[in-house]
Amino acid sequence: MKKLIAYYSRSGQNYFGGQIKEVEVGNTEKLANIINEVMDGDIYKIEQVNPYSNDYKTCVKQAMEDNKNNSRPELKNMLDSIDDYDVIYLGYPNYCGTMPMAVFTFLDSFDFSDKTVYPFCTHEGSGFGHSLNDLRKYCSNVERGIEIVGSKVDQKKDEIISWLKEIQWLNKQREEIV
């Protein structure tokens, strides 16, 4: 099974443990890197051609406006295809109760009907929000994901690895049945 770890993440000012802090690596990117260490797939960062501001408050306003307008921001370095992948780990921070609009652009760009998707989400208290319902509109096979408080990603590595081992075990069981 060929795996893709696709994620959206942002560095700069982030809401981190109750306060705004400057981060060099976004929380979702940290989580994506942990997943890649264990699952050893191809990794793709979903990036906007015109990224949001590094200033947290400006970024929030931009994200809210994009969400309100149901925008589909143009992505840079877009993948040509996902046809070779069977499993996709899709990561994102919770923006406005769902995925960032750039993730919707990514989802609009490909056919996910024969893909198994494992979502992973970072947040500061809002969990997946309604992102799983939104994701199921694009992907027919969304499996159990993981949501992690972004400011605690570094402390949750064991929990993340346990989730990934469970996925590996379930996939092995499915292969034995078939």
Question: Locations of the language-model features?
Answer:
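Redox-cofactor binding/interface segments in oxidoreductases and associated redox assembly factors
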Residues: 90-91, 119
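Short, conserved loop/helix-junction motifs that constitute active-site signature segments
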Residues: 82, 108-114
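N-terminal beta1-alpha1-beta2 submodule of the flavodoxin-like/Rossmannoid cofactor-binding fold
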Residues: 1-87, 97, 104, 158-178
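Solvent-exposed loop/turn segments at secondary-structure junctions
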Residues: 11-13, 49-51, 94-98, 124-127, ...
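Short, glycine-/small-residue-rich phosphate/pyrophosphate-handling segment
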Residues: 113, 118-155
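Active-site catalytic pocket residues across diverse enzymes, especially alpha/beta-hydrolases
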Residues: 39, 110, 139
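Short amphipathic alpha-helical segments and helix-helix/interface helices
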Residues: 32, 103-108, 132-135
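Short, highly charged low-complexity linear segments
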Residues: 67-70, 91-93, 149-155
